[in-house]
Design a protein with these regions (language model features):
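A short beta-strand submotif of the Rossmann-like class I SAM-dependent methyltransferase core
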Residues: 160
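Conserved Class I SAM-dependent methyltransferase catalytic core
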Residues: 186-248, 253-255, 259
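Conserved S-adenosyl-L-methionine
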Residues: 4, 8-137, 153, 157, ...
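Mobile active-site "lid"/loop adjacent to the S-adenosyl-L-methionine
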Residues: 56-57, 164-196
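Hydrophobic alpha-helical scaffolding
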Residues: 83-87, 144-148, 153, 157, ...
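A Trp-anchored, charged/polar loop motif used as the substrate-binding/catalytic surface
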Residues: 129-148, 191-199, 241
Length: 260
């Protein structure tokens, strides 16, 4: 588990709960915008593969094996499943896990999800293109028609456990988000990463899309965060807030969290 910048990889039982609640389908696009080791996407793949095999009247396959996959299973992963993380080491782990899980690993992309205005600059680098070009090419196709930037996408499902320690202090990033403003509508000098991820994840969703995001419990309780809750309530239909035990991310952090 990685503790820098508040990154703590998500326990499997939390991932499984989120995947079952989101219930991704074979024809839906899914992304983890703060992927870490890509637990959400790997287990979503298993979930959909089981559904594909059930549809065909076949027994469930064995996960994390060299078992041969059907064309439908392979095509689902290549076309529909995406993951982004700013940490290149985490991305390498994710690509390895995805390869073990049986997918083509190409849609795990090393980018800063929040700093999308610099994506064009980053993606032109030769070394980056060698590793991530094909996945990025597929990602661009999921933007709304006519889009000329990377602010909005048309994903059906977004799942993420964004870093919840440390602040974003770069004005260039903060001013691209409504939640970069405080409760009085004034631009802030620093904003919690997880706060900006709320808005960013919603921008990844198409209308009617579904999201599961792990947030510090204080976002649901603190009076100073009421404007954040109002922002969410104005844009979403909240289906559940699931409180996680205080030990969920121990020994790395005792921060109380919930899944929205």
């Amino acid at each position: 588990s990685k503790g820098e910048k508040g990154q703590y990889f998500t326990p499997r039982y939390v991932i499984d709960m989120c995947v079952k609640m989101m219930n991704p389908k074979e024809d839906e696009y899914i992304i983890d915008t703060a992927a870490g080791s890509s637990g959400f996407t790997v287990h979503s793949i298993f979930h959909v593969w089981d559904a594909i095999r059930e549809r065909k009247g076949l027994p469930k396959g064995e996960n994390f094996t060299a078992e041969e996959r059907s064309n439908d299973e392979i095509k689902y992963v290549e076309d529909r499943v995406f993951a982004i993380d700013f940490d290149e080491k985490a991305v390498r782990v994710a690509k390895t896990l995805n390869l073990i899980a049986g997918d083509g690993k190409t849609n795990v992309i090393n980018l800063n999800t929040l700093d999308y205005s610099r994506w064009d600059e980053i993606t032109k680098q030769d070394r980056w293109q060698d590793a991530y070009f094909e996945g990025f090419r597929r990602l661009k196709k999921i933007r709304p028609a006519g889009a000329n930037d990377y602010k909005e996408f048309n994903f059906d499902v977004v799942m993420a456990n964004p870093p919840f320690a440390g602040d974003i202090k770069e004005n260039q990033i903060i001013t691209r988000y409504e939640l970069g403003k405080n409760s009085k509508g004034k631009w802030q000098n620093k904003v919690g990463r997880d706060i900006l991820f709320i808005e960013r994840n919603l921008n990844f969703l198409k209308p009617g899309g579904r999201m599961a995001i792990i947030l510090p419990q204080g976002r649901f309780n603190n009076s100073s965060d009421q404007y954040i809750r109002e922002f969410i309530a104005e844009r979403c239909r909240i289906l559940a807030v699931v409180g996680l035990h205080g030990n969920t991310f121990k020994p790395h952090t005792g921060t109380k969290t919930s899944v929205l």
